[in-house]
A protein has these predicted regions:
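Active-site acidic/histidine proton-transfer and metal-coordination neighborhood
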Residues: 1-68
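Active-site beta-loop-alpha junctions enriched in small/polar residues
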Residues: 2, 41-43, 69-75, 102-107, ...
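Gly/Pro-rich active-site loop or hairpin
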Residues: 15, 49, 72-161
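Alpha-helical elements of Rossmann-like donor-binding domains used by nucleotide-donor carbohydrate transfer enzymes
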Residues: 17, 24, 51-54, 88, ...
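Hydrophobic faces of well-ordered beta-strands that scaffold small-molecule active sites
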Residues: 36-38, 64-69, 98-101, 162-167
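Alpha-helix N-cap/loop-to-helix initiation residues
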Residues: 44-45, 144, 148, 170-174
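Short active-site-adjacent structural elements
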Residues: 108-111, 172-176
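C-terminal helical cap(s) of enzyme catalytic domains, especially alpha/beta-barrels
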Residues: 174-189
Length: 190
């Protein structure tokens, strides 16, 4: 699976290989009038806030931006420090953010397996059905513990009109998720 931890992901060799590829992608994107967006995930090479900051420090290029998905930074060891982690991301990376995701995060209880949703398509790529691994589950917005008030407030400080893409939901859940997000935007004066 693309989502399960691999030991090489957290080595200097793995980081250097990833850095070279991302550097090349950033240059190529920039040469074609685009920006390559990095989306992090805890089990990937770039998964923590510190690893993200390190990557942007080493690939300081206008062709590289961040796809902000705060839920992808949370693991069992830091989910209880949610506000601290959210503030750390914004305090160190806000100028790199180009697009934002809206989904949620919560502890998965006793289920430590890789989690996938039944989206009604048995042949769907795992990237479309993935909903978390280990002790963390990544449901649709409003179905978890993400501090959306803080997330949207911090996001809007420098990015008031940023595209926010809802993910990890089924088609029939779109109205509920949209109502949830609209309510959070309104409640925070956004």
């Amino acid at each position: 699976s693309d989502w399960v931890h691999h030991p090489r992901n957290k080595t200097e060799e793995g980081f250097e290989e990833c850095r070279k590829v991302i550097s090349d992608l950033a240059r190529t994107a920039y040469d074609h009038g685009a920006v390559f967006l990095l989306e992090t995930y805890v089990n990937n090479v770039v998964g923590s806030v510190e690893e993200t900051v390190k990557m942007f420090a080493q690939v300081d290029h206008p062709g590289l931006g961040l796809l902000m998905d705060p839920t992808n930074y949370f693991e069992a060891h830091n989910i209880d420090r949610m506000d601290q982690v959210l503030n750390q991301v914004f305090n160190t990376l806000t100028d790199k953010i180009k697009i934002a995701h809206a989904k949620d995060v919560k502890r998965s209880g006793g289920d430590k397996s890789e989690k996938h949703a039944d989206i009604g398509d048995a042949d769907a790529h795992e990237g479309l059905t993935f909903r978390g691994v280990g002790e963390i589950e990544l449901p649709a917005p409003g179905l978890g513990a993400l501090n959306y008030d803080l997330y949207l407030k911090r996001l809007s400080e420098k990015h008031p009109n940023i595209p926010v893409i809802i993910e990890h939901l089924t088609e029939d859940d779109v109205p509920r998720a949209k109502t949830f997000l609209d309510g959070k935007f309104r409640a925070n004066g956004l």
